[in-house]
């Protein structure tokens, strides 16, 4: 059990890094997503006692359609993660690519559903910020220390490695660096592995995201990949989304792969994955348990259902599998 003494035994060595200025807009999406999740949690969309330790509650109220969209996203990704954990009986590892301020590790621990090891990867600048929060806030550090076999836990500005949890600062476009750092933190390529990318691939060029998907498929014999991002971006609504992001210096470099659900599945299948499925978020929303829908729709009034539908039709949840027939990975669905 973690104690105050053990909490204080997390030590850090500060270091600096130079980040490409062109990535500033992409890094800014981490803050946007964290603020949106924090607000949705604050009004009761889902339970997450950890997000408050990474981001302050914004004074700006988020629109109801945004809150419902984030609820569907969190619910959908969570259901697929738990399905993978059940199939593997938690004898597996999870690699969250572009994790930002994600709190899945802590929430899975609370549900006694932790994999053998949970890895997070993001830009070094984002990782530095996350590690600072972990170091300074016992509700975040204590669960890590409880699972760690040693009395002290070393971390520097860009990496934390413990028995069950690791955070790595790396550029997903540099696969040799990514693999080297993951292996340094004891990533086991023989274990069934779930990789997660939420609004990550779309900020990479099609070639870069294809290389990442191929690397993932080639690195693990039994694996699953979850991808959440834009879809149906060729219509007028999609073009407006692209223009709005460009005005914020955030270019969707990989938007051409987001034409349709079919193009999303084809990308996965053409880069080493054996099965691929995809649903847009409106379809996913319509599949939610009716009791949950009634609960969240009672939280706040939504003027225009059409706006929610437009938004949800332009995001999708995709998942792909490779190997793992004996585990039933191909049977995983939403």
Curated annotation (Swiss-Prot):
GO BP annotations listed: C-terminal protein methylation; G2/M transition of mitotic cell cycle; negative regulation of protein-containing complex assembly; protein methylation; protein modification process; regulation of apoptotic process; regulation of glucose metabolic process; regulation of mitotic cell cycle spindle assembly checkpoint
Keywords of the record: Methyltransferase, S-adenosyl-L-methionine, Transferase
InterPro entries: LCMT1 (IPR016651), Ppm1/Ppm2/Tcmp (IPR007213), SAM-dependent_MTases_sf (IPR029063)
Catalysed reactions, semicolon-separated: [phosphatase 2A protein]-C-terminal L-leucine + S-adenosyl-L-methionine = [phosphatase 2A protein]-C-terminal L-leucine methyl ester + S-adenosyl-L-homocysteine
Cited Gene3D superfamilies: Vaccinia Virus protein VP39
Role: Methylates the carboxyl group of the C-terminal leucine residue of protein phosphatase 2A catalytic subunits to form alpha-leucine ester residues.
Organism the protein comes from: Homo sapiens
CC annotations in GO: cytosol; nucleoplasm
E.C. code: 2.1.1.233
Highest rank taxon of the organism: Eukaryota
Binding site for S-adenosyl-L-methionine: 37, 73, 98, 122, 171-172, 198
GO molecular function per UniProt: protein C-terminal carboxyl O-methyltransferase activity; protein C-terminal leucine carboxyl O-methyltransferase activity; S-adenosylmethionine-dependent methyltransferase activity
Gene behind the chain: LCMT1
Top-level EC class: transferase
Family: Belongs to the methyltransferase superfamily. LCMT family.
Lineage summary: Eukaryota, Metazoa, Chordata, Craniata, Vertebrata
Keyword Transit peptide in annotation: no
Keyword Chaperone assigned: no
Protein name: Leucine carboxyl methyltransferase 1
